[in-house]
Structure formats: structure tokens, C-alpha cells
Amino acid sequence: MKHYELLFILKPTLTEEEVKAKVDFVKEVITKNGGEIATVIEMGTRKLAYTIKKYERGTYFVIYYKAPPALLAELTRNVRITEDIIRFLSVKYENKREIAAWERLCKGIKQTIKKEPREPRAPREPRVEKVDEQTFTEE
């Protein structure tokens, strides 16, 4: 089974019950066709970068799942005919590095870069500007 991620945006006008029904529908399509859902993340309602189907906001969801490759065509077909999903993106994780990232994302672990503290620097000496002394004579 391959590792996948499905991000989809629902209309912001849906009630909580309708949102739950749409998410359950997508989860059902995945499980009925032989997929295993690892995690579902609700990212909340956010402003869209640009207007999509006359909507400026949308409710974001991400589903991480494992599935046979044949499921992707069926899932795409079902998501496209669902009018309440205004946009979706499906991502396939292939190599070991990507699969490791998929597993971290499923667990909700954010990748952080550990920075080692730098050694303290010696204090700088105050800068003194030398001005050439010029003598002016009156004529």
C-alpha cells in the first residue's frame, strides 16, 4: 500500500453537521476501497489566497491514509462530484524520506531545526575617530 495525503477545502457556509457528514463521506470512500486512515486533521476556516467559486474563505481538512493505487481514481471521482468540496489536492509519498515525513505528520510532530548556541563574542571596543588637526590662520 502507498502513502497518501488528501487536502480538501469545504464551503464555509456549511453547518457543523454538514461538515462532519462530508468528512465522514470522504473517510468512507477511502475505507470502502481498501484504504487505512492514519489521521484526520481539521485546520479550521481560513481565508483563501484568491476567490474560488465565489468564496473567500474555506474550511480546510487533511487526511493521511494508506491505500492501493487503484483507490486514488475512485477517490478523485467522488471528491470531484461533491459540490461542497471547492478544492482538493492529493499527494503521494514515495521514497523512504517522504514516508518518514508522512509518519511524522501523522503523529503531529513538527520538524524543527536545532540550533546550537553560539559562543559569546568579546565586547567590542568603542570606535574612536581620529580627526586631523588643522590649524587655520587668519589672513
Curated annotation (Swiss-Prot):
Stretches the record annotates as Disordered: 114-139
Gene3D superfamilies listed in its UniProt record: 3.30.70.60
Role summary: Binds together with bS18 to 16S ribosomal RNA.
HAMAP family to which the protein is assigned, alphabetical: Ribosomal_bS6
InterPro entries (UniProt xref): Ribosomal_bS6, Ribosomal_bS6_sf, Ribosomal_S6_plastid/chlpt, Transl_elong_EF1B/ribsomal_bS6
One Gene Ontology term of the molecular function aspect: small ribosomal subunit rRNA binding
Ranges in a coiled coil: none
Family: Belongs to the bacterial ribosomal protein bS6 family.
Gene that produces this protein: rpsF
Pfam family, one: Ribosomal_S6
Protein name per Swiss-Prot or TrEMBL: Small ribosomal subunit protein bS6
Domain of life (superkingdom): Bacteria
Biased composition (Basic and acidic residues): 114-133
